[in-house]
Amino acid sequence: MIFGRPGSLVGAALYKEILMTDSARRINLGAIDCAPRPHLPDGFRRNSVRIGPTLGAERSGLSVYELPPGQAVGPYHYEEPEEEWLLVVSGTPTLRHPEGEERLEPWDIVFFPAGPAGAHLVRNNSDKSARVAMFSSSGATVGAVVYPDSDLVWVWTADDAVDMVVKRSSKVDDIAPWIADRNETET
């Protein structure tokens, strides 16, 4: 997908095409009301809304986060096999990534590849609210979110009932030989 401002040549063509297509679904990121998430711990108390399902998306996602000062979208993490994009709509959030931290500005776009190179945390260290949009691929039926700071892995599937969060350092020695054997015998 190509991202651009409506005033740019590429952005204008894409923007016009989407708005004039009868089957396209449109929403204004600045006009969305984000729902409070008071159950989240301090440091992650954000308002948010998942827009992808609302617009009928089945293989991609879009969530909008309103970050009060001192709050983050979530813990430092990366995903497998998902890719993500971040668009700063307003404010100046701070992005933590594998090479350090940097302050972002409105209209900044950041791409996070799947895997450790795409690890990130978005926090609002400013004294004013910030709004960001996160786009993600979501065609996989099984995946994992790895939280390096807490040594946790969230394994998700198409069935929420079998999703789980586990410690990466947990040992499952009794099953390891079976997995190795399975990988060698199946082609």
What are these regions (language model features)?
Residues 99-114:
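Short acidic-glycine-tyrosine-enriched beta hairpin
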Residues 4-7, 11:
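Residue-identity detector for glycine
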